[in-house]
């Protein structure tokens, strides 16, 4: 089961999925991210996601595409070594800033040199 919380903060929206992000839960995540399409800056906190497969990664990439089409941007906060390794191995961290803390990810939002 995947739970998703959305918090609106000054300057960005925090999307925090909690639970496995995989083929079984990806539709719920896609829907949540699609609901944020009008937001300028989105920070996705993956710290509560113990597992993510290619479906979850694809949903993240789709959210990035939509945000950038609307002149926005996305950053990811994640302190889980297994997910950081996945994001690095797939090259995801070359298109989006991936930082260990929310604070670091917020600083990277909108900074073209942050990736």
Task: Name each model feature, range by range.
Residues 1, 82-85, 108:
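Acidic/proline-rich low-complexity IDRs
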């Amino acid at each position: 089961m995947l739970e998703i919380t959305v918090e609106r903060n000054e300057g960005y929206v925090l999307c925090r999925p909690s639970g496995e992000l995989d083929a079984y839960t990806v539709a719920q995540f896609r829907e949540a991210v699609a609901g944020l399409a009008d937001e300028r800056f989105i920070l996705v906190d993956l710290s509560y996601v113990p597992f993510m497969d290619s479906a979850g990664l694809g949903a993240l990439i789709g959210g990035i595409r939509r945000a950038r089409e609307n002149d926005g941007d996305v950053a990811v906060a994640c302190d889980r070594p297994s997910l950081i390794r996945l994001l690095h191995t797939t090259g995801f961290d070359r298109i989006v800033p991936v930082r260990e803390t929310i604070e670091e990810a917020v600083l990277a939002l909108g900074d073209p040199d942050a990736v």
